[in-house]
Amino acid sequence: MDKPVVWARVMKVLGRTGSQGQCTQVKVEFLGEQNRQIIRNVKGPVREGDILTLLESEREARRLR
């Protein structure tokens, strides 16, 4: 359970998701030595340039239709 937390920068806000639009789907880029981008669902206010703390860095969200 002692996985290190990973920081990621929001590169682009893709849209709202969830049954009532309560989540925002964003594309994030990992900070540090990893040069990867994934799509995540974020709850709460978020905009481009924000830094997120990801407790789980392997899980990727499904794309919006």
Swiss-Prot record:
Q: Its Gene Ontology biological processes?
A: cytoplasmic translation; maturation of SSU-rRNA; ribosomal small subunit assembly
What SUPFAM superfamilies does the record tag this protein with? Answer: Nucleic acid-binding proteins
Q: Supply the alphabetized keyword list.
A: Ribonucleoprotein, Ribosomal protein
PROSITE patterns in the cross-refs: RIBOSOMAL_S28E
GO terms for CC?
Answer: cytosolic ribosome; cytosolic small ribosomal subunit
What Gene3D superfamilies does the entry give? Answer: Nucleic acid-binding proteins
Which molecular function terms from Gene Ontology are attached? structural constituent of ribosome
Q: Does the keyword Ribosomal protein apply?
A: yes
**Could you tell me which Pfam families the record lists for this protein?**
Ribosomal_S28e
InterPro entries linked to this entry? NA-bd_OB-fold, Ribosomal_eS28, Ribosomal_eS28_CS
Family to which the UniProt record says this protein belongs: Belongs to the eukaryotic ribosomal protein eS28 family.
User: Mind telling me what this protein is named?
Assistant: Small ribosomal subunit protein eS28
Gene behind the chain: RpS28b
